[in-house]
Amino acid sequence: MNSIQFPLLDRTAQNSVISTTLNDLSNWSRLSSLWPLLYGTSCCFIEFASLIGSRFDFDRYGLVPRSSPRQADLILTAGTVTMKMAPSLVRLYEQMPEPKYVIAMGACTITGGMFSTDSYSTVRGVDKLIPVDVYLPGCPPKPEAVIDAITKLRKKISRELYEDRIRSQRANRYFTTNHKFHVQHSIHTGNYDQRVLYQPPFTSEIPTEIFFKYKNSVSSPELVN
């Protein structure tokens, strides 16, 4: 364009055109409209409820809480996760569309907290079930800390590359009742192998030779009589 023939158009065009990349535009739109799925099970979730008030006003970050995982791209776990709740949490995470993010809020969610000491029914860290993007320690964390975690997640989203999101395929991590871990690729059907989740401890810990020898010795007539 000849700036001599159109001087006014040249001056206004410089203030109206924004040059950016498709990746940056996608990141900007996602970090400005995070829709969280609130997974609160304990007292830490009460601190997150304080963000809804006018003092902190979490609406300025574009957060819109959703009740369905299919409409959410962020799951915020707060509180203790038990072994019976582990399959439900994994199922909720798998139902969320990509890209999706996780914020672990509170000591009980991150490490199991005081409930994980000599406990057979508490998951020792939610990162053993689903991948966590931001850890938020505290018992419970303050609302200011929750805002700081959301800010850090927004910075992480702004630096993401589309190629890296396509290349990274996350797998399901199954947590058994014996605190053993199994990795299996996602099939996106919502169905899970209950035999893997609830396998009996005696068949997996006792060797085969000793197990059958023990059965034969108990069922022998000499020991029964």
Curated annotation (Swiss-Prot):
Top-level enzyme category: translocase
- Could you tell me what reaction this enzyme catalyses? a plastoquinone + NADH + (n+1) H(+)(in) = a plastoquinol + NAD(+) + n H(+)(out); a plastoquinone + NADPH + (n+1) H(+)(in) = a plastoquinol + NADP(+) + n H(+)(out)
Keywords of the record: 4Fe-4S, Chloroplast, Iron, Iron-sulfur, Membrane, Metal-binding, NAD, NADP, Plastid, Plastoquinone, Quinone, Thylakoid, Translocase, Transport
Q: How does it sit in the membrane?
A: Peripheral membrane protein
| Chain sites annotated for binding [4Fe-4S] cluster | 43-44, 108, 139
Superkingdom of the source species: Eukaryota
Family per UniProt? Belongs to the complex I 20 kDa subunit family.
Query: Function of this protein?
Result: NDH shuttles electrons from NAD(P)H:plastoquinone, via FMN and iron-sulfur (Fe-S) centers, to quinones in the photosynthetic chain and possibly in a chloroplast respiratory chain. The immediate electron acceptor for the enzyme in this species is believed to be plastoquinone. Couples the redox reaction to proton translocation, and thus conserves the redox energy in a proton gradient.
Write the protein's name: NAD(P)H-quinone oxidoreductase subunit K, chloroplastic
Organism, as annotated: Nicotiana tomentosiformis
